[in-house]
């Protein structure tokens, strides 16, 4: 590569080459050279959240008369450009880098410095952009900002959409009775609406967990600087920064109750990952129910038909598979894997600092994004338009001997068990067998064993 495509930069460790068109400086370049590990870069949403923090901090330092209006305005303008999605190609660093995320913090400082120095003379990445800050409080804060914004603006709306889709579908189907199943075996009947109400409740419970956690998640480590003591930061910096960010985003960010905890641990991230795990498990349950209900069309349950979205086999013509529930199950598996990684990473808080912050940032961001998309996909491409196969459902329901459970109070458990076995063995309806083995006539049995009535607690 031609020398003309590089420029020479210098830092405390000496000189090195930096691409001529790069907005970053020597510390970022050293990280680029040192951490050629993977193709996993710091998430875009995290970079934008970090820029939002720098924007708030520049304004706060100006309010506190620590930065000149000109420098603060230049820094804030550059940071806002990044927050709005510009210059993202200037953040090339691998997530597998220094565990504090110092490389990414300096990447941001250097890019903002470069952009700002075109507006005013000499905006220094450390002295001005990083004023009153340490990577040790900035990166944990950026993780919380990123997570909070994603939960509020993406995940919760997606979950609400999924819940509404479930509720609307249940309402449109109505009280169609079907075989209940426990242990994947025939059980007493339930209605579609009852079965789907469990799905809706799972999503609702998961939403409530996220909403409760937001109070903790919006506490920021900023202001604690290197070890939590706040050295080199104005005591009012964190509060003033949060005021600016809250006005812009509508969030409720505030300084952490304990800055030592906020820097040395990643408890809030671990709690968030636990919420992600709960939602992932719920989505797996719903998806697997849909897959089983859709199974067949001839050799399975065949209770519903999911929308046919694409050919299902490269060798079997006409085969159509439940691709959306399968996709969602894979999302859930990825989220569960991310949760385990986050758990291990959260254990790496030694004394005053956790040193796996970039990994936590990446996995949290990925999980939140995947879950948001999965909720939308499941709602719009599976639940919204599946069809109920009433003939199949009614046929299976009519031949379900477990309905004899409703006779327990009249004929006793032992007689009921004999009726069930006989009906199974002879492949006859429960009403036919019960009318032979009891004193109850067919009309009485039909009333007692009415599947619709059996779905109601009467």
PLM feature spans:
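Conserved, well-structured ligand/cofactor-binding cores
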Residues: 1-458
């Amino acid at each position: 590569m031609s020398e003309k495509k590089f420029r020479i930069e210098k830092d405390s460790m000496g000189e090195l080459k930096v691409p001529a068109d790069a907005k970053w400086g020597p510390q970022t370049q050293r990280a680029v050279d040192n951490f050629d590990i993977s193709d996993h870069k710091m998430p875009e949403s995290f970079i934008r959240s970090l820029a939002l923090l720098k924007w708030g901090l520049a304004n706060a330092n100006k309010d506190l008369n620590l930065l000149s209006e000109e420098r603060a305005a230049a820094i804030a303008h550059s940071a806002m450009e990044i927050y709005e999605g510009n210059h993202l190609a200037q953040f090339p660093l691998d997530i597998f880098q220094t565990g504090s995320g110092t490389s990414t913090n300096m990447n941001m400082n250097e890019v903002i410095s470069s952009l700002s120095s075109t507006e005013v003379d000499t905006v220094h990445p450390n002295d001005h952009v990083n004023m009153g800050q340490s990577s040790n409080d900035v990166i944990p804060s950026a993780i919380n900002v990123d997570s909070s914004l994603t939960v509020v603006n993406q995940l919760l709306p997606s979950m609400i959409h999924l819940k509404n889709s479930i509720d609307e579908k249940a309402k449109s189907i109505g009280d169609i009775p079907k075989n209940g199943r426990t242990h994947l075996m025939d059980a007493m009947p339930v209605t579609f609406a009852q079965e789907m109400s469990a799905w809706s409740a799972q999503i609702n419970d998961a939403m409530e967990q996220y909403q409760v956690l937001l109070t903790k998640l919006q506490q920021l480590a900023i202001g604690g600087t290197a070890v939590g003591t706040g050295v080199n930061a104005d005591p009012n910096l964190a509060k003033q920064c949060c005021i600016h960010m809250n006005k812009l985003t509508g969030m409720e960010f505030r300084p952490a109750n304990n800055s030592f905890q906020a820097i040395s641990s990643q408890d809030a991230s671990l709690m968030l990952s636990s919420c992600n795990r709960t939602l992932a498990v719920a989505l797996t349950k719903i998806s697997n129910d849909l897959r089983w209900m859709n199974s067949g069309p001839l050799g399975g349950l065949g209770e519903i038909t999911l929308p046919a979205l694409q050919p299902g086999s490269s060798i079997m013509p006409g085969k159509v598979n439940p691709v959306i529930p399968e996709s969602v199950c894979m999302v859930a598996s990825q989220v569960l894997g991310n949760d385990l990684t986050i758990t291990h990473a959260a254990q790496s808080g030694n004394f005053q600092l956790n040193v796996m912050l970039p990994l936590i940032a990446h996995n949290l961001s990925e999980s939140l994004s995947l879950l948001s998309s999965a909720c939308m996909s499941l709602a719009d491409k599976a639940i919204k338009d599946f069809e109920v196969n009433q003939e199949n459902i009614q046929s299976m329901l009519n031949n379900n001997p477990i309905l004899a459970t409703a006779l327990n109070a009249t004929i006793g458990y032992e007689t009921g068990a004999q009726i069930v076995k006989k009906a199974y063995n002879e492949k006859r309806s429960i009403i036919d067998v019960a009318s032979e083995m009891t004193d109850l006539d067919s009309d009485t049995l039909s009333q007692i064993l009415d599947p619709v009535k059996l779905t109601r607690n009467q």
